């Protein structure tokens, strides 16, 4: 039995993590975010009602679940207050269910200004960030000049630290990026207005998780973005600014790494990517348009159209290695309904003619890489909403089996629609 279960994306994000986390939290007592910020976009559909969460863990909708934002998350007070209000307006008592680590770095207005100024300066070489200040906030954290939730307990010292760091960043904005300076007093006033709310939710997360482990409580760790966007192991520099792999759980929450029991990789039945960066299996034809339309592939956070392509098992195998995956949850299988044939990328052809079955490391090494496909028969029958494996077409079952063969990891959960009831749990991670 696994008490601590990690749910993370195995591709470039947008795999459908939110629904699965919400489904599995029926048995969890805690749900923990351990990296990223409000650049995430987790969509839940419950009884036909759609909820999009960017910062607060997906377990917040559950009455008996405590949601935790761990130290690995960069926290925007403005984004958190907005999300809290939206949920509270719907009758969800967020403050009774949400806890924060005092070590969470704060995202403030100058981080957003820097993010946008840098993307503008890059021009055609822009990374495609969400423009929400995520990267600059992590940069401040590593440079040891960042302000954290815990700093809000001493308001006078916070004001002094803020003044110092803003002088540094405003100098960059004005003199290097030729942008407007950010107003110190406004940032201070806005932050002080919510300081007491933030500090009232602070808890020692590492200690709480250790006590939960000793009691045998079920804990779900909710990843954001996807493995191939990891700052160290992704398609650098077209990556996010945090560790999206399973290793980020320990550093981003304070849980001892030996206590991770099961890692569930969310795997979309095809591939998508938002923004710039390598994508060997990308489709530019009518099939790509079909996947985009049928899958409603527009970002929950940015609204941007996602790039689409066939499932890339070479890249997914890298995710298997990096995360020591226990099992997959296959999502959006129904999007492939109606295609005469489906393809799996099983290898890459390098510019020098070599065939490889492992991914390059840096973005520059992906240049000229061509996908090598294996083609399988598609299916005309609908898989939408199917709740039993026996109800799937044989061609869909063959597709599932081939993914398992190519990756060496079992598919333990199959999602056939956006509602949490439209799911087959073949093996429950908490029972594995």
From Swiss-Prot:
Residues the record lists as binding IMP? 14-17, 39-42, 130, 144, 225, 240, 304
Q: How is the cofactor bound?
A: Binds 1 Mg(2+) ion per subunit.
Task: Indicate the principal place this protein occupies in or around the cell.
Answer: cytoplasm
Residue positions of the active site? 14 (proton acceptor), 42 (proton donor)
Co-factor requirement: Mg(2+)
Specify which residues bind substrate according to the UniProt entry for this protein. 300-306
GO cellular component terms? cytoplasm
List keywords of the entry alphabetically: Cytoplasm, GTP-binding, Ligase, Magnesium, Metal-binding, Nucleotide-binding, Purine biosynthesis
Q: Extract one GO BP annotation from the record.
A: IMP metabolic process
Molecular-function GO terms, alphabetical: adenylosuccinate synthase activity; GTP binding; magnesium ion binding
Give the CDD domains listed for this entry.
AdSS
What subcellular compartments does it reside in? Cytoplasm
The pathway that the record names for this protein is: Purine metabolism; AMP biosynthesis via de novo pathway; AMP from IMP: step 1/2
Record-listed GTP binding positions? 13-19, 41-43, 306, 332-334, 415-417
- Family of this protein: Belongs to the adenylosuccinate synthetase family.
What the entry lists under HAMAP family is as follows: Adenylosucc_synth
Q: How does it assemble?
A: Homodimer.
Name of the protein this chain belongs to: Adenylosuccinate synthetase
Which organism is the protein's source? Shigella flexneri
What would be the name of the gene that encodes this protein?
A: purA
